[in-house]
């Protein structure tokens, strides 16, 4: 196994990138977190932003207050408008990559709206090449807003079935948290967390405060509260090994979760 940068470089020059020894050497390389003190918050599109002023304004107030003590990367979901676009595009026979572009445009719109509400506090909206300015914005105002859709667009990996993009805004926000090495990932939804069934339609649904990815899959809950690819991403992540899902419609929940409290459902990698 390589014990130095020089040895790792030698392996990179000599071996296939899938070579087991090279893979082991790369895995043993020193780990580095870019933004270890930051938290990524994903604001749901359909669950929060689509509800309008009544849901969004209280969250804006919480975010403004929370950024005094926390560094926040605030990602936006797409929501109902994206679902409408998906239905039209799928009916036209268009592929997942095109649907991903359409969904991204809606998440962008939501980021723009949230950004305008936070503009007077100096909190910017960043995206694309602008993500390189995130550390500066966090240093100055402790928060940024970004569109949650990952930028795969036409390069979106096809779903196993159908043409709905499998990696959407939940995945995009999680991937940003993982790549930046953030300390926490919070999904802000319109439910208290994960249930044994859909609480909107089943009166027998039972709340689950904590669960692992494997337990979710075993119970058939892997495509319920989060996009199912997020669970696989969580299991393969190095830095973010658990996420919390909270009800953003309850005042104070986000603030408590940022402070490290167990507010909703915590989903663990193992």
UniProtKB/Swiss-Prot annotation:
Chief place of localization: cytoplasm
Superkingdom of origin: Bacteria
Q: Which GO terms describe its molecular function?
A: molybdenum ion binding; nutrient reservoir activity
Question: Keyword S-adenosyl-L-methionine: yes or no?
Answer: no
Keywords for the protein's UniProt record, in alphabetical order: Cytoplasm, Metal-binding, Molybdenum, Storage protein
Q: How does activity depend on pH?
A: Optimum pH is 6.5 to 7.0. Above pH 7.1 molybdenum is released.
Cellular component terms, GO, for this chain's entry? cytoplasm
Induction pattern: Requires molybdenum.
Subcellular location, record wording:
Cytoplasm
What binding partners and quaternary form does the record give?
A: Octamer consisting of 4 alpha and 4 beta chains.
User: What does the similarity note say?
Assistant: Belongs to the UMP kinase family. Highly divergent.
| Record function comment | Intracellular storage of molybdenum. Binds polyoxomolybdates. Can bind at least 90 molybdenum atoms per protein molecule.
The name under which this protein is listed is Molybdenum storage protein subunit beta
Q: Which organism is it from?
A: Azotobacter vinelandii (strain DJ / ATCC BAA-1303)
Q: What is the lineage of its organism?
A: Bacteria, Pseudomonadati, Pseudomonadota, Gammaproteobacteria, Pseudomonadales
Q: Which gene encodes it?
A: mosB
């Amino acid at each position: 196994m390589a014990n130095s940068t020089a040895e790792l470089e030698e392996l990179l020059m000599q071996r296939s990138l899938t070579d087991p020894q090279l893979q082991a050497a790369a895995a043993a390389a020193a780990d580095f977190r870019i933004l270890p003190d930051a938290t990524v918050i994903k604001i749901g599109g359909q669950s929060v932003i689509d509800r309008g002023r009544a849901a969004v304004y209280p969250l804006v107030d919480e975010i403004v207050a929370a950024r005094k003590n926390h560094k926040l990367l605030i990602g936006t979901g797409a929501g109902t408008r994206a679902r409408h676009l998906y239905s039209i595009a799928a009916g036209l026979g268009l592929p997942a990559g095109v649907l991903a572009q359409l969904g991204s445009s809606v998440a962008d719109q939501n980021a723009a709206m949230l950004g305008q509400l936070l503009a007077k506090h100096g909190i910017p909206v960043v995206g694309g090449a602008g993500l390189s300015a995130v550390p500066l914005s966090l240093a100055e105002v402790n928060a940024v807003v970004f569109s949650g859709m990952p930028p795969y667009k036409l390069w979106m990996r096809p779903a196993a079935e159908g043409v709905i993009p499998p990696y959407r805004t939940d995945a995009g926000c999680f991937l940003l948290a993982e790549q930046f090495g953030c300390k926490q990932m919070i999904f802000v939804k319109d439910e208290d967390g994960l249930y044994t069934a859909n609480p909107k339609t089943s009166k027998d649904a039972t709340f689950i405060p904590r669960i692992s990815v494997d337990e979710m899959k075993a119970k058939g809950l892997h495509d319920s509260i989060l996009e199912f690819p997020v669970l696989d991403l969580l299991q393969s992540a190095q830095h973010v090994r658990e996420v919390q899902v909270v009800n953003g419609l309850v005042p104070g929940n986000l603030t408590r979760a940022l402070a490290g409290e167990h507010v909703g459902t915590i989903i663990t990698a193992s």
